[in-house]
């Protein structure tokens, strides 16, 4: 039995007799914290939870030091879904929506018709990478799986579920041939594991622990489950970042903004709703090189 982090974690597993690895993710507290920042309609909250689960799974598969960003855009009721997950497994997310266009049973294609999905890896060192694919699957799981098909990488499949309280995800990925080198046997092995994964119901994914899920799916296959890695919600906004945005405007424009906004500038974080206030004294201190050590006001 593995000691698990409280509610939010990823957990890797591998098949001993085939070239396939997997990753499971469970999100509760971080999902709740994201939803607490914005009163999303249920279909939007579900989509955002699925995208959060996907980002956490992807960070588990990539070896990098930096930030992974998943961004879905459309001209429909949900013009934007965006999730960021750092290599330290710190997660945040946001959605934009038009509530008048959302029905209770709306799915991905109802909410985001003709959409696109961008995956960006922004390392602290090295070159930024971005790939874009049409959001043409029946759900986010299929759309993300299609992304990896289009990018001609190793076979990768996603299963994502969220219900407004918890978000769960399963990723399966082919590894380079080692255990099985015959191409036909390799294809059959891959088809075997994804066919079994596709029998997993939403109720099972959202309600069962990882060991039970793996036993139900693969009790005839030798599978090794590794230690869990914790995930948490954390927003990267700060008063310092907001101050840097003001400095980039230049002194004259920053002072003019203070005047236009009745003596203080409010900078709101779109992710967590943190609000940073800067008055004329703060602005003068910034441009005099005094830094941001003495905030006039910062509030939620």
UniProtKB/Swiss-Prot annotation:
Keywords noted in UniProt: Chaperone, Cytoplasm, Disulfide bond, Redox-active center, Zinc
S-S pairs: 235-237, 269-272
PTM comment: Under oxidizing conditions two disulfide bonds are formed involving the reactive cysteines. Under reducing conditions zinc is bound to the reactive cysteines and the protein is inactive.
Any single biological process term in GO: protein refolding
First-listed, main subcellular location of the protein, grouped into a coarse class: cytoplasm
Gene3D superfamilies for this protein: helix hairpin bin, Hsp33 domain, HSP33 redox switch-like
Top-level taxonomic group: Bacteria
GO CC term (a single one): cytoplasm
InterPro entries in UniProt: Heat_shock_Hsp33 (IPR000397), Heat_shock_Hsp33_C (IPR016154), Heat_shock_Hsp33_N (IPR016153), Hsp33_helix_hairpin_bin_dom_sf (IPR023212)
Single GO molecular function: unfolded protein binding
Cellular location(s): Cytoplasm
Pfam family, one: HSP33
Family statement: Belongs to the HSP33 family.
Summary of the function given for this chain in its UniProt record: Redox regulated molecular chaperone. Protects both thermally unfolding and oxidatively damaged proteins from irreversible aggregation. Plays an important role in the bacterial defense system toward oxidative stress.
NCBIfam families: PRK00114.1 (NF001033)
Identification of the protein by name: 33 kDa chaperonin
Lineage of origin: Bacteria, Pseudomonadati, Pseudomonadota, Gammaproteobacteria, Pseudomonadales
